[in-house]
Amino acid sequence: MSSINTTFTKQHRQCDEMFADAEAAVAAGNWQQAGQDFSAFATSMECHLTNEEEILFPAFEDKTGMREGPTMIMRDEHIHIRRLINEMTSDIEQQDADHYLGLSETMLILMQQHNTKEEQMLYDMCDRALGDDAKDQVLHNMKDLG
């Protein structure tokens, strides 16, 4: 059986790779490719965030009763990630490389810090708190990033 940590960390790495592809395309001035790459990143990131917010976090909260702990903090950070994605989408549409690349640095730092908290704390907590049946249900209900 896969662990929560292994499965969700894999999604982080997939999103990281897509984000790097989009950044490289913007830096190269290849706006068509940048649009495709960033759209793929945004779609995959939204799928990942939804997997957490609608499947993993509720299972963890139901099992532990912790509704105002780490999952609340992660949800708040998800709001910031979504805002940056919206701004960066606009930058690609306007072909504003300087603004995009500035936001890209902010997004990269945010994602690194966010992923570290999840991978080194929250996912392990989920693996410990959820029994095998609940873990299997979470992993079964997840949507693939594509």
Language-model-detected regions and their locations in the chain:
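Small-residue-biased structural context
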Residues: M1-G146
